[in-house]
Amino acid sequence: MDQNKFVNYKDYKSYPIEEMQQRSIDFLGDIQRRRTIRDFSSKGVPEEIIINCLKSAGTAPSGANRQPWHFSVVSDSETKKKIREAAEKEEKKFYSGRAPDEWLEALAPLGTDENKPFLEEAPYLIVIFSEAYGLDEKGNKIKNYYVPESVGIATGILITALHNAGLATLTHTPSPLNFLREILGRGENERAFLILVTGFPSKTATVPDIQRKDLEDYTSFF
């Protein structure tokens, strides 16, 4: 192994065990307050906050360090309107016949339908694209690895960073998502992963009265 390609890891920060325990408790308490919001305020968000959160997302691990993601940040009202119109067109098809009954029954407790006003009301839409393959300076294809896993991890970090900054989020996945690549002018090598809606919750925002699984329901120790 070529040692010249490695540098000493100097950024690790150590904490006493007691402080580690408290930090884990504090983080748990904070992240447990995170909820998906569908009613957003039109109150503006400083762009620098969004930029810092995107930089956090960019630290995500990825297959072979390819970093196969692109974040299109939309705040322009006309572009948001185009995205809403295209999304609602697909969602109308979904709710009126494309989706199987079992899927619709699973969605019923969440109160969702084809109407997506949040796509215009929220100050920011972050459209996340995955790169099926990269391109070099000459336009030659570069193979990417573990693309869905890599983009999913980056998205999770972004959601956490936005929550930590005091913003609410909504993951929106109209199907199909092809219209996003056209509206936002992305390349043929990219696939829309999801729309992350973010901003402040409205003063009248509500959330479904649902419960998360208990630890023992999703964890095994060996």
Could you describe each region identified by the protein language model?
Residues 1-37, 41-51, 85:
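N-terminal accessory segments that position/regulate proteins before the catalytic core
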Residues 2-23, 113, 191-222:
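C-terminal helix-cap and adjacent tail motif
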Residues 34, 55-58, 126, 132-183:
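Small-aliphatic-rich amphipathic alpha-helix that forms the alpha element of a beta-alpha
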Residues 56-58, 109-114, 180-182, 205:
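Glycine-rich, charged/polar anion/phosphate-binding loops
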Residues 58-65:
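Glycine-rich phosphate/pyrophosphate-binding beta-alpha loops
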Residues 65-69, 120-122, 191:
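Short, basic and Ser/Thr-rich N-terminal targeting/leader segments
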Residues 73-151:
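Glycine/small-residue-rich phosphate/adenosyl-binding loop
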Residues 180-193:
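Short, electropositive alpha-helical surface patch
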